[in-house]
């Protein structure tokens, strides 16, 4: 077939993800760190929390299942997230730290502190740190039965 006569060439428009920023300007994101005793999630969103920028878990960084919640896996996940944030122009983070909560444990898992530390060491500025663990006002019954867990 012969080429068409009235065909116009469209110019490709360069689309960049993330906010348009000037040099030295601080752009905030929100890092949601969910540290249970089985895994650690490091999830960075924009300030509204609706747009995900990057999400990495400890299980994505290590091979063995037993190491998913380890501080080392959390550190690798946080470094990965920080690198992605920098490439998209986010220079500072507010931290929302969460444990399992509800009628389960209210203490964060072993990866929480190392994930937070890794974000701080990767030249990301830290804004506010907030604990958003769900605390029940009156909960459903906890597992373990009347006499509790017997070892």
From Swiss-Prot:
Domain of life per record: Eukaryota
Q: Give the UniProt entry's GO cellular component terms.
A: ribonucleoprotein complex; ribosome
Q: Locations of Basic residues compositional bias?
A: 142-151
GO molecular function terms noted in the UniProt entry = structural constituent of ribosome
Quick one: where's region Disordered? 130-151
Q: Which InterPro entries match?
A: Ribosomal_uS11, Ribosomal_uS11_CS, Ribosomal_uS11_sf
GO BP: translation
Does the record carry Ribonucleoprotein as a key word? yes
Q: Give the keywords, sorted.
A: Ribonucleoprotein, Ribosomal protein
Family statement drawn from the similarity comment of this UniProt entry: Belongs to the universal ribosomal protein uS11 family.
Know the name of this protein?
Small ribosomal subunit protein uS11
Source organism per UniProt: Aedes aegypti (Yellowfever mosquito)
């Amino acid at each position: 077939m012969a080429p068409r006569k009235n065909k116009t060439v469209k110019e490709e428009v360069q689309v960049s993800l993330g906010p348009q920023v000037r040099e030295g300007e601080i752009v905030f994101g929100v890092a949601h760190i969910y540290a249970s005793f089985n895994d650690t999630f490091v999830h960075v969103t924009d300030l509204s929390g609706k747009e995900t920028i990057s999400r990495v878990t400890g299980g994505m960084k290590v091979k063995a299942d037993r190491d998913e919640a380890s501080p080392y896996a959390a550190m690798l996940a946080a470094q990965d997230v920080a690198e992605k944030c920098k490439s998209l122009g986010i220079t500072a983070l507010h931290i929302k730290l969460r444990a399992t909560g509800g009628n389960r444990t209210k203490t964060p898992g072993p990866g929480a502190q190392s994930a937070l530390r890794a974000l701080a060491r990767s030249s990301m500025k830290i804004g506010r740190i907030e604990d958003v663990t769900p605390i029940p006002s009156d909960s459903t019954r906890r597992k373990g039965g009347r006499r509790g867990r017997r070892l």
